[in-house]
């Protein structure tokens, strides 16, 4: 049955299986970014109520010079930094782990503190303290203020646009010792104001129609083409035009989509 899910800042659509009686395999070890991890991160960002993000916010990039020997060591540093931020008054955090071309991880995050005082040194100094064993240096850390709604969307536009093939998320750039186990690649902490998703079940094509699913997909494609043409992005334009192209008729009926927008 076709299903359309609407979020505050986008939506997705697809065909749910008629019979989901298969036995799900237990979740295994996380081995870098996967399509599922990208999708779940994007869905979360789509649900955030940007008008309710109170407090003093920063967008940070935290780096190290030397690659931690194991993923466990990296996450130990990240969790130690999170605890320091909580003690300092952090109210919410979103983070992602990505890799440089040389195979060294870095942390991107959006963090808020209660009050209105912006103190970059608090965040940076805490990171330098917990990551000193990996050669973290002051000049390798970057940050800027998340200035209200515009600042949040600037952060989202960067970290929601990257897919599993982006070089910073590609498994080819994983350190050799990390390829069997990377641990979680994104997460959230604290009080996040979220807009509840709206799920719409459409009539299946085997029940005298598709309930408008095919027409809706074409509308999404037309919007993507128009948006890419307006931006002058030839790669996005080519991708938008081909999003529903499939030579297999049965498979073409089930092609889904996921796109940003606003309510």
UniProtKB/Swiss-Prot annotation:
Specify the superkingdom.
Answer: Bacteria
Q: Tell me the keywords, alphabetical order.
A: DNA replication, Plasmid
Mind telling me which InterPro entries this protein's record contains?
A: EF_Hand_1_Ca_BS (IPR018247), ORF2/G2P_dom (IPR056906)
State any GO BP term from the record.
Answer: DNA replication
Q: Which organism is it from?
A: Xylella fastidiosa (strain Temecula1 / ATCC 700964)
The protein's name in its UniProt record: Putative replication protein PDa0002
């Amino acid at each position: 049955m076709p299903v359309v899910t609407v979020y505050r800042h986008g939506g997705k659509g697809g065909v749910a299986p008629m019979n989901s009686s298969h036995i799900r395999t237990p979740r295994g070890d996380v081995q870098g970014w996967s399509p599922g991890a990208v999708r779940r991160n994007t869905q979360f960002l789509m649900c955030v109520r940007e008008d309710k993000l109170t407090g003093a916010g920063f967008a940070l990039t935290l780096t190290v010079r030397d690659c931690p020997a194991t993923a466990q060591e990296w996450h130990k540093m990240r969790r130690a930094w999170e605890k320091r931020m909580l003690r300092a008054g952090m109210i919410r955090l979103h983070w992602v782990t990505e890799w440089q071309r040389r195979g060294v991880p870095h942390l991107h995050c959006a963090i808020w503190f209660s009050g209105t005082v912006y103190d970059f040194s608090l965040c940076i100094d805490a990171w330098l303290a917990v990551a000193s064993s990996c050669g973290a240096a002051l000049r390798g850390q970057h940050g800027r203020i998340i200035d209200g709604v515009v600042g949040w969307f600037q952060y989202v536009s960067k970290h929601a646009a990257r897919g599993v093939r982006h070089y910073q998320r590609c498994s080819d750039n994983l350190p050799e010792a990390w390829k069997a186990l990377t641990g979680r690649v994104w997460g959230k902490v604290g009080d996040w104001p979220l807009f509840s998703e709206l799920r719409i079940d459409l009539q299946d094509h085997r029940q005298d129609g598709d309930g408008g699913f095919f027409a809706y997909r074409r509308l999404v494609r037309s919007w993507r083409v128009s948006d890419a043409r307006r931006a002058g992005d030839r790669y996005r334009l080519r991708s938008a035009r081909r999003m529903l192209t499939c030579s297999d008729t049965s498979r073409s009926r089930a092609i889904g989509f996921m796109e940003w927008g606003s309510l």
